[in-house]
């Protein structure tokens, strides 16, 4: 490769998973949990070369002896030291690149505090010496990945959900709605309702087991009341799950009660509107002339939209809210778990995007606040 043709790095820092790879690729090279684990017990084996912290998959596999922490909560970085560890791990261990040689595209949830992206910018330039960087809004990238420039994206990951209406490539900031209800809340809720069944899950390691149960067995009910009756009258909906110690647990109506909280946040004691209403409210904040285009291009993105039947339920709920003659189309791409990353890969490899990067020189002249001027 000659100097001017260095591949950009695309890093989608989710609250739950980091997706990282090279611009122009069709899928991320590295996908690992955004966790940093620290030993719960003092090491007794002298000379074992025990580390004081573990990142990602290694932390996940040693979770029995570690306390696991997620440095990103609700899409906002709450622990910058741990975040640096995750980025360091991403560049040096997963992608095996020198970050000072590649421009890097990072992603962020909309309506994040300004300080969050300033600090991201500062760390990239000062700690990792990046030659250039850019911060893109996650939902906009998902829309690019679906091959559209107009539509409304409902993006729900592990830490935060948001609806972003986009018209001809521009996000409409006044109509963006954010919902701090996502995968991690559903995991916590599933822990709670499984405890009511008599199974106890309390530690950070056990939470990871529940997350796995959620990902493997949960689904969205098309009609919640009806499903509850079915579950009460027969055992057809029951599934069993084997815990790491060989114990087998049975899970019934919890399979759809947990994801139902997306549509009925009251289950979690939250007063916000469900995801279908949030989508509708977001569309209603837009100009009356473009609503038709948004209804017909509603794109789902993120891991928490991966539940079976989620798209059908969304279609049903939004149809009930929208005007009767409106054509409503919910688009649920099969790769939507990674569509933010894929959109980033597309964006960073466009020739027209190359002048959009914030260069090291610009950063040195203006400081971290440049990110608000250059990145929308």
From Swiss-Prot:
Instruction: Mark the residues carrying the PTM Tele-methylhistidine.
Output: 74
**Disulphide connectivity of cysteines:** none
Role summary: Actins are highly conserved proteins that are involved in various types of cell motility and are ubiquitously expressed in all eukaryotic cells.
Q: Where in the cell is it found?
A: Cytoplasm; Cytoplasm, Cytoskeleton
As one GO molecular function, the record gives: hydrolase activity
* EC number of the protein: 3.6.4.-
| Superkingdom | Eukaryota
Which Pfam families does this UniProt record tie to the protein?
A: Actin
Q: Which InterPro entries does the record match to this protein?
A: Actin, Actin/actin-like_CS, Actin_CS, ATPase_NBD
Q: Which residues carry this modification: Methionine (R)-sulfoxide?
A: 45, 48
Return the SMART domains for the record: ACTIN
Q: Which residues carry this modification: N-acetylaspartate?
A: 3
- What's this protein's family per the entry? Belongs to the actin family.
Which named protein is this? Actin, cytoskeletal 2A
State a GO cellular component annotated for this protein: cytoskeleton
